[in-house]
Amino acid sequence: MNIPERISALRALMEERGYDVYMVPTDDFHQSEYVGEHFKVREYITGFTGSAGTAVFTKDEAGLWTDGRYFLQADQQLAGTGVKLYKMGEPGVPTVEEFIASALPEGGTLGFDGRVVAIEEGAALEEAVASKDAKINYSEDLVGEVWADRPALSEKPAFALGEEYTGESTESKLARVREAMKKAGADVHVIAALDDVCWITNLRGDDVDFFPLLLSYAVITMDEMKLYIDERKLNDDMKADLAKNNITIHPYNAIYEDIKNLDTASTVLVDPTRLNYALFNNIPGGTKVVQQVNPTIAMKAKKNDVEIRNIINAHKKDAVAMTKWMYWLKTNIGKIEITELSAAAKLETLRKEQEGYLWQSFEPICASAEHAAIVHYEPTPETDVPLTQNGLFLTDT
């Protein structure tokens, strides 16, 4: 199916299920900035590949909201799809919430997958629909039903980081998190942010391109931690290390039902920007909830001596690769054909020579001549051009 056909299929489901407006954000179930292939739902339904944006569909309108980094790209990729670009922050452009409020009929229904909407955004949508006495249904992923060949969730294995890299044990990190919970007056902490779970457990993965993250959730109490993850990702040594810290392993999606069984006498700490709306709404009614930034955010920000030493070493290794690459460019430009893509490939080859290299941290931006004026330009076989001795060459890697 092409993009217009996909949108038509979505609208047919909207009609069948009683939705007047349906919203498709960029996020995964963990409110990640970048998402794995399984979660590229907004990209599938609009054709826009940028890392930020929200799509909204009505019975006869389709819109995509994105920021200034992607105006040019979105203009190009949305052409012929029937999706209108709404340039966020520009004069006269409504916000997503304002558009939804105006598009909903009295007593209508807004739909979205509550797993890919943060608590904070969910609250803003509740306020938006209230003016129309409308309802929210966050239980269905309609685009997922349209997407017949949707990639499965990543099954790539985890890997553990020793204290020679982390500088702190999981036991110590859990003790600090629990102390922060006490200060917040909470005895349960629900975490969905992938980087927070990975930091606490000293585990890493490859479930999101360019990021060492594992698809997982955590529920921490004062005496145990439940880790929700595909158990096949963990080897026996990892499981043993988790068990030493009274961390039990549970199926990845089981958290949604488990949360419903929390003791209503408990006080639950959640981050409204880093926990999804569906999970939040599964917390039993009457349970006291404290909404604040995950304590791990500040803990991760303050690097220990081991981390600082490793950061310095990593920069030195990358400096070696960059220096070799710039020398290669200067000595070979004009002698052999070097294109945007081949220059990027050469740099990665040189980085791979350095001990401990894993992968690049984002898709290389190698832009020659007029391509350098395109924000977040990424060369493709279709756009790749040769470098010239007199032109500008921009690199961000």
Question: What are the residue ranges of the model-derived segments?
Answer:
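Sequence-level motif detector for i,i+2 pairs with an aromatic at +2
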Residues: 186, 361-363, 389
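Terminal domain-start leader segments
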Residues: 1-339, 352-359
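A conserved beta-strand->loop->alpha-helix hinge within the catalytic CA
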Residues: 342
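Core alpha/beta catalytic barrel or barrel-like domain that forms the active/cofactor pocket
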Residues: 359-364, 397
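ATP-grasp fold ATP-binding core
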Residues: 192, 366, 395
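Flexible, glycine/threonine-enriched loop-and-boundary segments that flank and lead into catalytic domains
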Residues: 348-352, 365-389
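Structural motif
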Residues: 391-393
